[in-house]
C-alpha cells in the first residue's frame, strides 16, 4: 500500500496540469478509482457524529492513504504451446513475472517434464502417445482437438489469455490456433504472442509458420508476431546459437509482461482491465516495441528507442490503438513519465485509442523501460513484413526519414552496437517487431 503526503499529492496534480493527457490518466485511473482516504475509513467504521467530526479534524494532518490495487484483479493465464511456447513460459517464470497463471501444453511428455509451469497439460495422448508430432502441424491440430475438453477446463475462469508459441513446428503451429479458438469462443480476451522462425531454419518451417499464423489470426483478438531474424540486428556476431533462441524467448516474455504488468502491478498510473480490453479486443495484428535506457536523458531515449525502432515511423502512425507501459525504480519522476508520454503521443495518430501505465519496480532502479503495443494493422501488412525483408527495410528507411521530416526532429536512428544487448548498459536499447 502506497502512502503519499496530501501536500505532495496536491503538488503532483498541479504540476502535471501542463500535460492534459497525463493528468487525465492519473486522475481518472489512480486517484478517482483507487485512492481511499484514511478519513473516509475512520468515518465509515466509527459511529457518532461528534466522533466523526473529531476524527475528520484530526485527519487533516494525516497522510492520504491510497491503495492502487483493485478489489478484484483480472485473472490472467499464459498458455505456452509446443516446445517454443514451453521455453517462453519457463523464461517468464524465471524472470519473476507475477500475478499470472502459467500453463504448458505439449504432445511430448518428456518436454513437459522440463517445464517450470505449475499446470502442465499433455494433449493428444491417444494420437501421439506422448512422443510429439515430428514437426507435423496437422498432428498438432488433431492432438488439440482430441483434448479440447481438457484445454477448455484449463482456460475456465480467465479474463485474459495469452497464447505463446514458436510458429513453424508441429505442436505450436497446429495446436495454438485450436487453443485460441477455444479461448475466444468462451469470451476471454485472447492475445497471441508468437515467433516467426529464423531464415536458416528452412523454407518448409517458414511456410508452416505462415499457415499457422493465418489460422491463429482468425481466432485471437490481438496477434503479435516476432520475426526471429530481427534479433540478428541486436545480437552480437559472436552470440551462441542457444543464446539467440533465449533472446527470442525473452522477447516473448517482454510482450506478455508489458501488457500484464499494466493490469496487475500497482502503479503510479493505474490502468484497469477494461481499458486494456478496449484497445486490444478484435484489434487484429499488433507490433511490439521495447526501449531501455539508464543514461542522463533516459526517459526520452527509452521512448525514442521504443518508437523509432524499425517500422515504427509507419506503424505507430497507422495504429488504431496503442498500449504502453513505463517501468522504473523508485527514482523515476513524474516529469520523466510525462516526457515518455509526450514522445509517444506526438507520434501516434490523434484518433488512436491510447492507454498507458506507469509502474515502480525496485529491480529497475537507475533504468527506465518502455514497452509499446501498437494495434490495428491488417494481416496483409504483417505478411509483407514476414515474407519480404527488402520491403521491410524500405519501410524502415522511409519511416525513419519521414518521421524526422514531418516532426521536425533530428532523432538518432543508428545501428545497434553489440554492447547494447546488455541489460545494464548506459546506452539505450531498442526492439520493434
Swiss-Prot record:
Gene3D superfamilies recorded: Tubulin/FtsZ, C-terminal domain, Tubulin/FtsZ, GTPase domain
Main location: plastid
Tissue-specificity statement: In pollen grain, restricted to plastids of vegetative cells. Also present in pollen tubes plastids.
One protein family per Pfam: Tubulin
Entry-linked InterPro entries: Cell_div_FtsZ, Cell_div_FtsZ_CS, FtsZ/CetZ, FtsZ_C, Tub_FtsZ_C, Tubulin/FtsZ-like_C, Tubulin/FtsZ_2-layer-sand-dom, Tubulin/FtsZ_GTPase_sf
Membrane topology type: Peripheral membrane protein
Reported impact of residue 267 to R: In pmi4; reduced accumulation with impaired midplastidial localization in rings and filaments, giant chloroplasts, and altered chloroplast movements in response to blue light
Phenotype for residue 159 to N: Forms long filaments with impaired midplastidial localization, heterogeneous chloroplast population, one greatly enlarged with numerous smaller chloroplasts per cell
Sequence intervals crossing the membrane: none
MF terms (GO), sorted A to Z: GTP binding; GTPase activity; identical protein binding; protein homodimerization activity
One CC-aspect GO term: chloroplast thylakoid membrane
Transit peptide: 1-66
Comp. bias intervals (Low complexity): 414-433
Binding site for GTP: 83-87, 170-172, 201, 205, 249
UniProt keyword list: Acetylation, Cell cycle, Chloroplast, GTP-binding, Membrane, Nucleotide-binding, Plastid, Thylakoid, Transit peptide
PANTHER family: CELL DIVISION PROTEIN FTSZ HOMOLOG 1, CHLOROPLASTIC, CELL DIVISION PROTEIN FTSZ-RELATED
Annotated HAMAP family: FtsZ
Family listed: Belongs to the FtsZ family.
NCBIfam families the UniProt entry points to: ftsZ
Description of how the protein assembles with itself and partners: Aggregates to form a contractile ring-like structure; contraction of the ring was accompanied by an increase in the filament turnover rate. This aggregation is regulated in midchloroplast stroma by MIND1 (repressor) and MINE1 (promoter). Self-interacts and binds to FTSZ2-1 in heteromers to form two morphologically distinct types of filaments, termed type-I (smooth filaments) and type-II (rough filaments), in a GTP-dependent manner. Interacts with ARC3. Part of a complex made of ARC3, ARC6, FTSZ1 and FTSZ2.
Protein's name according to its UniProt entry: Cell division protein FtsZ homolog 1, chloroplastic
Source organism: Arabidopsis thaliana
Gene: FTSZ1
Amino acid at each position: 500500500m502506497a502512502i503519499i503526503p496530501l501536500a505532495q499529492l496536491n503538488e503532483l496534480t498541479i504540476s502535471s496540469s501542463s500535460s492534459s493527457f497525463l493528468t487525465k490518466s492519473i486522475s481518472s485511473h489512480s486517484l478517482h478509482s483507487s485512492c481511499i482516504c484514511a478519513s473516509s475509513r475512520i468515518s465509515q467504521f466509527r459511529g457518532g457524529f461528534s466522533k466523526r467530526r473529531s476524527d475528520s479534524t484530526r485527519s487533516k494532518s494525516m497522510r492520504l492513504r491510497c491503495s492502487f490495487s483493485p478489489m478484484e484483479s483480472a485473472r490472467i493465464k499464459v498458455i505456452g504451446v509446443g516446445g517454443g511456447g514451453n521455453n517462453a513460459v519457463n523464461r517468464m517464470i524465471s524472470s519473476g513475472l507475477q500475478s499470472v497463471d502459467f500453463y504448458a501444453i505439449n504432445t511430448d511428455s518428456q518436454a513437459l517434464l522440463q517445464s517450470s509451469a505449475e499446470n502442465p497439460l499433455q494433449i493428444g495422448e491417444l494420437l501421439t502417445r506422448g512422443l510429439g508430432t515430428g514437426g507435423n502441424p496437422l498432428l498438432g491440430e488433431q492432438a488439440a482437438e482430441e483434448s479440447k475438453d481438457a484445454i477448455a477446463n484449463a482456460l475456465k475462469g480467465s479474463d485474459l489469455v495469452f497464447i505463446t508459441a514458436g510458429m513453424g513446428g508441429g505442436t505450436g503451429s497446429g495446436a495454438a490456433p485450436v487453443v485460441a479458438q477455444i479461448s475466444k469462443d468462451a469470451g476471454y480476451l485472447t492475445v497471441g504472442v508468437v515467433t516467426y522462425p529464423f531464415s536458416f531454419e528452412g523454407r518448409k518451417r517458414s511456410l508452416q509458420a505462415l499457415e499457422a499464423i493465418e489460422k491463429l489470426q482468425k481466432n485471437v483478438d490481438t496477434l503479435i508476431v516476432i520475426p526471429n531474424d530481427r534479433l540478428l540486428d541486436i545480437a552480437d556476431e559472436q552470440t551462441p546459437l542457444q543464446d539467440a533462441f533465449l533472446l527470442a524467448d525473452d522477447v516473448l516474455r517482454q510482450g506478455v509482461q508489458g501488457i500484464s504488468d499494466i493490469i496487475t502491478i500497482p502503479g503510479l498510473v493505474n490502468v484497469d482491465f477494461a481499458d486494456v480490453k478496449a484497445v486490444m479486443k478484435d484489434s487484429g495484428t499488433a507490433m511490439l516495441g521495447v526501449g531501455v535506457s539508464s543514461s542522463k536523458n533516459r526517459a526520452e531515449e527509452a521512448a525514442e528507442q521504443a518508437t523509432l525502432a524499425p517500422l515504427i515511423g509507419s506503424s505507430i502512425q497507422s495504429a488504431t490503438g496503442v498500449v504502453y507501459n513505463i517501468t522504473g525504480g523508485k527514482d523515476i519522476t513524474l516529469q520523466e513519465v510525462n516526457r515518455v508520454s509526450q514522445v509517444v503521443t506526438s507520434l501516434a495518430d490523434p484518433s488512436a485509442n491510447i492507454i498507458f501505465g506507469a509502474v515502480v519496480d525496485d529491480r529497475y532502479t537507475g533504468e527506465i523501460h518502455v514497452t509499446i503495443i501498437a494495434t490495428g494493422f491488417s494481416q496483409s501488412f504483417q505478411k509483407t513484413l514476414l515474407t519480404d525483408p527488402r520491403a521491410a527495410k524500405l519501410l524502415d528507411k522511409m519511416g525513419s526519414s519521414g518521421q524526422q521530416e514531418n516532426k521536425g526532429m533530428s532523432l538518432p536512428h543508428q545501428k545497434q552496437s553489440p554492447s547494447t544487448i546488455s541489460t545494464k548498459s548506459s546506452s539505450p536499447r531498442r526492439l520493434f517487431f
